[in-house]
Curated annotation (Swiss-Prot):
The keyword Manganese applies. Mn(2+) binds at D121. Keywords: Glycosidase, Hydrolase, Lyase, Manganese, Metal-binding. Its EC number is 4.2.1.70. It catalyses: D-ribose 5-phosphate + uracil = psi-UMP + H2O. Belongs to the pseudouridine-5'-phosphate glycosidase family. One of its GO terms (biological process) is nucleobase catabolic process. It comes from the Bacteria. The active site is at E10 (proton donor), K142 (nucleophile). The gene is psuG. This is Pseudouridine-5'-phosphate glycosidase. GO terms for cellular component: cytoplasm.
Protein backbone atom coordinates (compact mmCIF):
# COMPACT_ATOMS: atom_id res chain seq x y z
CA UNK A 1 0.00 0.00 0.00
CA UNK A 2 1.28 3.46 -0.97
CA UNK A 3 2.30 5.54 2.05
CA UNK A 4 1.05 9.08 2.46
CA UNK A 5 3.65 11.84 2.04
CA UNK A 6 4.03 12.96 5.66
CA UNK A 7 6.67 15.26 7.15
CA UNK A 8 7.36 15.30 10.89
CA UNK A 9 8.25 18.65 12.48
CA UNK A 10 9.76 19.16 15.95
CA UNK A 11 8.43 21.38 18.71
CA UNK A 12 11.58 22.47 20.57
CA UNK A 13 11.91 25.34 18.12
CA UNK A 14 8.41 26.45 19.26
CA UNK A 15 8.93 26.21 23.03
CA UNK A 16 12.66 26.91 23.38
CA UNK A 17 14.16 28.03 20.07
CA UNK A 18 12.30 31.19 19.11
CA UNK A 19 10.56 34.03 20.99
CA UNK A 20 6.78 34.63 21.01
CA UNK A 21 5.04 35.30 18.58
CA UNK A 22 7.79 34.42 16.08
CA UNK A 23 7.78 30.81 17.35
CA UNK A 24 4.06 30.32 16.65
CA UNK A 25 4.18 32.09 13.27
CA UNK A 26 7.23 30.08 12.15
CA UNK A 27 5.67 26.75 13.17
CA UNK A 28 2.52 27.53 11.16
CA UNK A 29 4.64 28.75 8.20
CA UNK A 30 6.66 25.51 8.22
CA UNK A 31 3.47 23.47 8.10
CA UNK A 32 2.26 25.61 5.19
CA UNK A 33 5.55 25.11 3.31
CA UNK A 34 5.10 21.33 3.61
CA UNK A 35 1.50 21.59 2.37
CA UNK A 36 2.57 23.73 -0.62
CA UNK A 37 4.69 20.80 -1.80
CA UNK A 38 1.73 18.41 -1.61
CA UNK A 39 2.72 16.70 1.65
CA UNK A 40 1.08 16.49 5.09
CA UNK A 41 2.82 18.20 8.03
CA UNK A 42 2.72 16.64 11.50
CA UNK A 43 4.21 18.76 14.28
CA UNK A 44 5.03 16.52 17.24
CA UNK A 45 4.84 17.30 20.93
CA UNK A 46 3.49 16.07 24.26
CA UNK A 47 0.49 17.80 25.84
CA UNK A 48 -0.36 16.87 29.44
CA UNK A 49 1.44 13.56 29.04
CA UNK A 50 -0.20 12.65 25.74
CA UNK A 51 1.89 12.14 22.59
CA UNK A 52 0.57 14.26 19.74
CA UNK A 53 1.50 13.23 16.21
CA UNK A 54 0.17 16.38 14.61
CA UNK A 55 -0.47 19.24 17.02
CA UNK A 56 -3.49 21.45 16.35
CA UNK A 57 -2.89 25.16 15.83
CA UNK A 58 -4.26 25.75 19.32
CA UNK A 59 -1.81 23.20 20.80
CA UNK A 60 1.09 24.81 18.92
CA UNK A 61 0.07 28.16 20.40
CA UNK A 62 -0.12 26.56 23.86
CA UNK A 63 3.48 25.23 23.61
CA UNK A 64 4.62 28.57 22.19
CA UNK A 65 3.22 30.52 25.16
CA UNK A 66 3.36 28.06 28.07
CA UNK A 67 5.96 28.21 30.83
CA UNK A 68 7.82 25.17 32.20
CA UNK A 69 7.57 23.19 28.97
CA UNK A 70 10.03 20.28 29.19
CA UNK A 71 12.68 20.04 26.48
CA UNK A 72 12.97 16.32 25.83
CA UNK A 73 15.25 13.99 23.95
CA UNK A 74 14.56 10.28 23.53
CA UNK A 75 15.75 9.62 27.11
CA UNK A 76 13.03 11.83 28.63
CA UNK A 77 9.98 10.77 26.56
CA UNK A 78 8.73 8.22 29.09
CA UNK A 79 9.09 10.65 32.02
CA UNK A 80 7.14 13.39 30.21
CA UNK A 81 4.29 10.95 29.58
CA UNK A 82 4.31 9.37 33.05
CA UNK A 83 4.40 12.76 34.81
CA UNK A 84 1.73 14.22 32.48
CA UNK A 85 3.90 17.11 31.41
CA UNK A 86 3.85 19.46 28.45
CA UNK A 87 6.97 18.70 26.45
CA UNK A 88 8.68 19.95 23.32
CA UNK A 89 10.49 17.29 21.32
CA UNK A 90 14.09 17.77 20.18
CA UNK A 91 15.49 16.08 17.08
CA UNK A 92 16.08 12.76 18.87
CA UNK A 93 12.63 12.55 20.48
CA UNK A 94 10.86 13.67 17.31
CA UNK A 95 12.68 11.03 15.28
CA UNK A 96 11.80 8.23 17.69
CA UNK A 97 8.12 9.20 18.01
CA UNK A 98 7.75 9.87 14.28
CA UNK A 99 9.30 6.53 13.34
CA UNK A 100 7.02 4.74 15.81
CA UNK A 101 4.12 6.41 13.96
CA UNK A 102 5.41 5.20 10.58
CA UNK A 103 6.79 8.56 9.38
CA UNK A 104 10.02 8.49 7.35
CA UNK A 105 10.73 12.18 6.67
CA UNK A 106 11.51 14.89 9.22
CA UNK A 107 12.47 18.56 8.86
CA UNK A 108 14.33 20.52 11.51
CA UNK A 109 16.61 23.57 11.68
CA UNK A 110 19.93 22.08 12.71
CA UNK A 111 20.90 18.96 14.62
CA UNK A 112 22.71 18.94 17.95
CA UNK A 113 26.26 17.69 18.26
CA UNK A 114 29.41 18.28 20.31
CA UNK A 115 29.56 21.60 22.17
CA UNK A 116 32.57 23.92 21.96
CA UNK A 117 34.89 23.78 24.96
CA UNK A 118 32.74 20.96 26.43
CA UNK A 119 33.67 17.89 24.32
CA UNK A 120 31.85 15.52 26.68
CA UNK A 121 28.55 17.38 26.06
CA UNK A 122 27.26 15.40 23.07
CA UNK A 123 23.65 15.69 21.95
CA UNK A 124 21.29 12.69 22.04
CA UNK A 125 20.52 13.60 18.42
CA UNK A 126 23.68 11.85 17.20
CA UNK A 127 22.82 8.55 18.89
CA UNK A 128 19.27 8.65 17.52
CA UNK A 129 20.53 9.47 14.02
CA UNK A 130 22.78 6.40 14.24
CA UNK A 131 19.87 4.08 15.07
CA UNK A 132 16.70 5.32 13.40
CA UNK A 133 16.03 4.86 9.70
CA UNK A 134 14.68 8.19 8.55
CA UNK A 135 15.38 11.07 6.18
CA UNK A 136 16.25 14.12 8.29
CA UNK A 137 16.45 17.47 6.52
CA UNK A 138 18.50 20.13 8.30
CA UNK A 139 20.75 23.10 7.54
CA UNK A 140 23.74 21.17 8.87
CA UNK A 141 24.30 21.52 12.57
CA UNK A 142 24.11 24.58 14.72
CA UNK A 143 27.10 26.86 14.18
CA UNK A 144 27.52 27.20 17.96
CA UNK A 145 28.88 23.64 18.06
CA UNK A 146 32.37 22.20 17.67
CA UNK A 147 32.15 21.56 13.93
CA UNK A 148 35.10 19.22 13.49
CA UNK A 149 34.22 16.98 16.44
CA UNK A 150 30.55 16.81 15.41
CA UNK A 151 31.52 15.71 11.88
CA UNK A 152 33.79 13.02 13.35
CA UNK A 153 31.02 11.78 15.66
CA UNK A 154 28.57 11.51 12.75
CA UNK A 155 31.13 9.48 10.81
CA UNK A 156 31.96 7.23 13.78
CA UNK A 157 28.27 6.53 14.36
CA UNK A 158 27.76 5.68 10.66
CA UNK A 159 25.29 8.47 9.92
CA UNK A 160 24.87 8.92 6.16
CA UNK A 161 25.41 12.64 5.55
CA UNK A 162 24.24 13.91 2.15
CA UNK A 163 24.87 17.44 0.91
CA UNK A 164 21.84 18.72 -0.99
CA UNK A 165 23.09 20.46 -4.14
CA UNK A 166 26.35 21.17 -2.32
CA UNK A 167 29.77 19.56 -1.84
CA UNK A 168 30.38 21.28 1.49
CA UNK A 169 28.75 20.97 4.89
CA UNK A 170 26.43 23.92 5.59
CA UNK A 171 26.61 25.39 9.08
CA UNK A 172 23.10 26.52 9.97
CA UNK A 173 23.34 30.34 9.57
CA UNK A 174 26.13 29.96 6.99
CA UNK A 175 25.69 28.37 3.55
CA UNK A 176 29.06 26.61 3.35
CA UNK A 177 32.02 25.55 5.45
CA UNK A 178 35.46 24.27 4.49
CA UNK A 179 34.36 20.72 5.38
CA UNK A 180 33.51 18.55 2.38
CA UNK A 181 30.64 16.06 2.41
CA UNK A 182 31.28 12.57 1.04
CA UNK A 183 27.92 12.27 -0.72
CA UNK A 184 26.02 14.81 -2.80
CA UNK A 185 22.43 14.56 -4.05
CA UNK A 186 20.86 16.99 -6.49
CA UNK A 187 17.20 15.99 -6.32
CA UNK A 188 14.63 14.60 -3.86
CA UNK A 189 14.53 11.46 -6.01
CA UNK A 190 18.25 10.80 -5.44
CA UNK A 191 17.78 11.14 -1.69
CA UNK A 192 14.86 8.70 -1.78
CA UNK A 193 16.93 6.24 -3.85
CA UNK A 194 19.67 6.26 -1.19
CA UNK A 195 17.07 5.79 1.56
CA UNK A 196 15.43 2.87 -0.26
CA UNK A 197 18.79 1.13 -0.74
CA UNK A 198 19.59 1.49 2.98
CA UNK A 199 16.18 -0.02 3.75
CA UNK A 200 16.78 -2.97 1.41
CA UNK A 201 20.19 -3.61 2.95
CA UNK A 202 18.81 -3.34 6.49
CA UNK A 203 21.41 -0.71 7.42
CA UNK A 204 20.43 1.18 10.55
CA UNK A 205 20.55 4.93 10.89
CA UNK A 206 19.31 8.08 9.27
CA UNK A 207 20.12 9.93 6.09
CA UNK A 208 21.04 13.41 7.23
CA UNK A 209 20.27 15.78 4.36
CA UNK A 210 22.38 18.92 4.77
CA UNK A 211 20.39 21.63 2.99
CA UNK A 212 22.17 25.01 2.86
CA UNK A 213 20.40 28.15 4.05
CA UNK A 214 19.23 30.32 1.09
CA UNK A 215 22.10 32.58 0.02
CA UNK A 216 20.17 35.82 0.58
CA UNK A 217 19.57 34.87 4.23
CA UNK A 218 23.02 33.65 5.28
CA UNK A 219 25.39 35.42 7.65
CA UNK A 220 29.10 35.61 6.68
CA UNK A 221 31.14 33.04 8.63
CA UNK A 222 33.66 35.56 10.05
CA UNK A 223 30.90 37.84 11.33
CA UNK A 224 29.05 34.91 12.87
CA UNK A 225 32.20 33.60 14.59
CA UNK A 226 32.57 36.88 16.48
CA UNK A 227 29.03 36.58 17.87
CA UNK A 228 29.52 32.91 18.75
CA UNK A 229 32.78 33.46 20.64
CA UNK A 230 31.14 36.15 22.77
CA UNK A 231 28.04 34.02 23.44
CA UNK A 232 30.12 30.93 24.38
CA UNK A 233 32.26 33.02 26.76
CA UNK A 234 29.12 34.44 28.41
CA UNK A 235 27.67 30.94 28.84
CA UNK A 236 30.88 29.82 30.55
CA UNK A 237 30.87 32.88 32.84
CA UNK A 238 27.27 32.17 33.84
CA UNK A 239 27.83 28.43 34.37
CA UNK A 240 25.22 27.48 31.77
CA UNK A 241 25.40 23.91 30.46
CA UNK A 242 23.33 20.87 29.45
CA UNK A 243 19.88 21.40 27.95
CA UNK A 244 19.91 25.11 28.80
CA UNK A 245 23.05 25.80 26.77
CA UNK A 246 21.68 25.80 23.21
CA UNK A 247 18.64 28.04 23.95
CA UNK A 248 20.94 30.44 25.85
CA UNK A 249 23.47 30.63 23.02
CA UNK A 250 20.81 31.10 20.31
CA UNK A 251 19.15 33.84 22.35
CA UNK A 252 22.47 35.64 22.88
CA UNK A 253 23.30 35.34 19.17
CA UNK A 254 20.01 37.06 18.32
CA UNK A 255 20.89 39.94 20.64
CA UNK A 256 24.53 40.22 19.59
CA UNK A 257 23.67 40.15 15.86
CA UNK A 258 20.84 42.67 16.15
CA UNK A 259 18.30 40.03 15.12
CA UNK A 260 20.20 38.78 12.04
CA UNK A 261 20.55 35.22 13.35
CA UNK A 262 16.82 35.05 14.15
CA UNK A 263 15.91 36.09 10.60
CA UNK A 264 18.35 33.50 9.22
CA UNK A 265 16.95 30.81 11.53
CA UNK A 266 13.40 31.38 10.27
CA UNK A 267 14.54 31.33 6.62
CA UNK A 268 16.38 28.02 6.97
CA UNK A 269 13.50 26.38 8.86
CA UNK A 270 11.05 27.22 6.07
CA UNK A 271 13.57 26.15 3.42
CA UNK A 272 14.05 22.77 5.12
CA UNK A 273 10.29 22.24 5.46
CA UNK A 274 9.89 22.85 1.71
CA UNK A 275 12.59 20.35 0.77
CA UNK A 276 11.23 17.76 3.22
CA UNK A 277 7.80 18.16 1.58
CA UNK A 278 9.33 17.44 -1.83
CA UNK A 279 11.20 14.41 -0.48
CA UNK A 280 8.07 13.01 1.21
CA UNK A 281 6.14 13.29 -2.06
CA UNK A 282 8.99 11.61 -3.98
CA UNK A 283 9.12 8.83 -1.36
CA UNK A 284 5.37 8.21 -1.62
CA UNK A 285 5.82 7.82 -5.40
CA UNK A 286 8.64 5.35 -4.93
CA UNK A 287 11.41 7.83 -5.67
CA UNK A 288 10.77 8.31 -9.38
CA UNK A 289 9.27 11.21 -11.33
Amino acid sequence: MKKQPIVALESTVIAHGLPWPTNFETAVSMENKVKEKGAIPKTLGIINGEIKIGLTEKEIEHLAKAKNVMKIGTAEIAAAIALRRNAATTVSATMRLAKNAGIDVFATGGIGGVHRNVPWDVSQDIMELSKTRMIVVCAGFKSILDVERTIEFLETFQVTVVGYQTDYMPLFHTKESEYKVNIRADSPEEIVAIFNEKEKLGIEGAILVANPIPEQSEIPREELEEYIKKAVAQAKENGISGKSLTPFLLSRLTELSGGKTLTANIALLKNNASLAGEIAVALSRGGRD
